[in-house]
């Protein structure tokens, strides 16, 4: 058995995506020069993929300033996505950050608009994945929702700490609480098949 060394660099420049629509029926149009570059180093077990997409359309979504990054700089893997989704009445900036290490994934989603009424906020959670015991081991996820703020129509709302557990086809929501003064949404319960 001979060991291989899969070390490579790539630098892809994208000018025209007509072939994706024609052959693969992917509804993607790139309007300006976009790039996808990175590397994979087998010996160091490192990877990095970064993409820049200044202006594109996927189905009916118009996107500007798109950026993706995926890398494993140390003992974790990190992914970032940033974009501006253009709407008829303004734009929405979106940012997704995720880090994974030791069966844990930390995720933060930020959004904000630039219209007359503000809609913005953050959703942050940490998911822990583990296997259930027994004859047929299943994947279980425990998602801890972190406290954050959300602005809906210029009004500050709070997301309070809660937990969601996904186990064997069941989803348990434990004390999800979203509030503004005396108005709130509280969810406790189980979704099942």
Language-model features and meaning:
Residues 1-193:
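Interface amphipathic segments
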């Amino acid at each position: 058995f001979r060991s291989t060394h899969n070390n490579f660099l790539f630098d892809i420049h994208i000018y025209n995506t007509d072939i994706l629509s024609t052959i693969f029926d992917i509804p993607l149009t790139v309007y300006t020069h976009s790039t996808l570059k990175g590397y994979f180093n087998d010996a160091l077990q490192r990877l990095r993929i970064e993409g820049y997409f200044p202006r594109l359309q996927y189905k009916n979504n118009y996107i500007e300033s798109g950026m993706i990054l995926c890398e494993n700089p140390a003992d974790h893997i990190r992914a970032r996505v940033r974009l501006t989704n253009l709407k008829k009445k303004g734009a929405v900036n979106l940012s997704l950050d995720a880090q994974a290490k030791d069966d844990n994934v930390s995720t933060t989603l930020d959004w904000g608009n630039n219209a007359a009424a503000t809609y913005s906020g953050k959703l942050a959670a940490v998911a822990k994945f583990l296997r259930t015991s027994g004859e047929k081991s299943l994947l279980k996820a425990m998602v801890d929702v972190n406290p954050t703020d959300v602005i809906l129509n210029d009004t500050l709302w709070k997301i309070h700490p809660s937990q969601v557990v996904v186990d064997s086809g069941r989803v348990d929501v434990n004390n999800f609480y979203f509030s503004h003064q005396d108005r709130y949404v509280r969810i406790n319960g189980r979704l099942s098949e």
